């Protein structure tokens, strides 16, 4: 009754090569660019006049407006719709009616 047989030398060499490659890839990932100085990406959104007109028309048509509704009707992302609505709230075009952690409901300012 013998135990398990030893693995061949070629199998051991292949395993060692794979481990060495994994270590190299891990080191390359660690040496990636740091997020300091000029490497930080600006997330500012600029809105063109055509999009603003679309948004204002949608707001006039609807009694209430949410970021999701605005995004689907205007063809923009929800995050951009949120930013637009916040900007319009600061300009007193819309008024925040209700808010919880997931949803913001706006109405047209009268």
Curated annotation (Swiss-Prot):
GO terms for cellular component: cytosolic small ribosomal subunit. Keywords: Ribonucleoprotein, Ribosomal protein. Residues 12-37 have a biased composition (Basic and acidic residues). It holds the Pfam family Ribosomal_S25. The keyword Ribosomal protein applies. GO terms for molecular function: structural constituent of ribosome. InterPro entries: Ribosomal_eS25 (IPR004977), WH_DNA-bd_sf (IPR036390). Residues 1-37 are annotated as: Disordered. The keyword Ribonucleoprotein applies. Signal peptide: none annotated. Belongs to the eukaryotic ribosomal protein eS25 family. This is Small ribosomal subunit protein eS25. It comes from Saccharolobus solfataricus (strain ATCC 35092 / DSM 1617 / JCM 11322 / P2) (Sulfolobus solfataricus). The lineage of its organism: Archaea, Thermoproteota, Thermoprotei, Sulfolobales, Sulfolobaceae.
